[in-house]
Amino acid sequence: MLTCIIKYHIDPTKKAAFEQYARNWGQAIPRCGADLIGYYAPHEGSSTLAYGIYNIPDLAAYEAYRARLAADPLGRENYEFAQSEKFLLREDRTFLKLVSTPHGAQK
């Protein structure tokens, strides 16, 4: 299992547009095959950093998921929304693998 973390630099004056973008992905991403953990908008501290986080089985599954997302009507609409509103200043993706187990008390 891989976790994809998307780090966004957003225009702080367009936070509401980013939040709409995140809500749209909240529908499209699970429908297209990824396990969405969530989208996170700035609250305190930096007003320009936001994140999207989801799990995917492997890179081959990621490629298939991206193709489905590009063909999804809401996915296409959301890509176009981001382009037209220009609230995303930068977007970086990294794939991480969980290498620890929970550290709390086990029941």
Labelled PLM ranges:
Residues K7-P12, Y54-D58:
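Short beta-strand-to-loop capping motifs
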Residues G45-T48:
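Short acidic/glycine-enriched loop/turn segments that link adjacent beta-strands
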Residues L2-K7, F18, A28-I29, A50-I53:
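Short, structured motif recognition centered on aromatic/hydrophobic residues
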Residues E91-K107:
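Short, low-order "capping/linker" segments at domain edges
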Residues Y40-A41, K97:
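Residue-level recognition of beta-strand->loop/alpha-helix junctions
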Residues Q20-I37, N55-T94:
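An amphipathic, aromatic/His-enriched active-site/gating alpha helix that lines ligand/cofactor pockets
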